[in-house]
Amino acid sequence: MPKPTKGPRLGGGPAHERLMLANLAQSLFEHKSIKTTETKAKRLRPVAERLVTFAKRGDLHARRRVMGIIPSKSVVHELFTEIAPLVAERDGGYTRITKLGFRKGDNAPMVQIELVLEPVTPKVRSSRTSTATAPAAAAPAAEAPAEESDVPVEETDAVEHTDETPAETTDEAAAEVEADAAEKSDK
């Protein structure tokens, strides 16, 4: 009795499944993008991502482990020399699956699985408290100059007034944010 595998079975025995995934991975690395069924693509994704991780490591042992799965030396060479440097900055997520519709004939869901070779763009990280108070503090600060321009005041009074206003608006904005958070938590 064959050992059960994780995920849907692809037909045939375990050896046939391994060979099918190896051939799909070889085609993916050779063409950078392939069109296949959704089930096969979902089973291929972890295999391909593991092979790319080996290629990023780049040592002889990693190359031999990949050669144990993909028999084509030219595809393994391309994986280690061309694909691995392009995804060197990326921490996982080397493949993308895009749904294409249904196949004519058996109505199987078709997808396109492709390598993500675009350079990674780092996300700007910020804390929740600073992002919540920044827009609230910016809005009252934007209104303060409008109020000052409507009322003519001596320059010395205006300078003293502006020194007090940002501190007051910041405190008020922080109090509003805390009140809004308290109202949301009560609901």
Curated annotation (Swiss-Prot):
Residues 127-144 have a biased composition (Low complexity). Belongs to the bacterial ribosomal protein bL17 family. Residues 145-157, 165-180 have a biased composition (Acidic residues). The keyword Glycoprotein does not apply. NCBIfam families: L17 (TIGR00059). HAMAP family: Ribosomal_bL17 (MF_01368). GO terms for biological process: translation. The gene is rplQ. It comes from the Bacteria. The lineage of its organism: Bacteria, Bacillati, Actinomycetota, Actinomycetes, Micrococcales. Part of the 50S ribosomal subunit. Contacts protein L32. PROSITE patterns: RIBOSOMAL_L17. The keyword Ribonucleoprotein applies. GO terms for molecular function: structural constituent of ribosome. This is Large ribosomal subunit protein bL17.
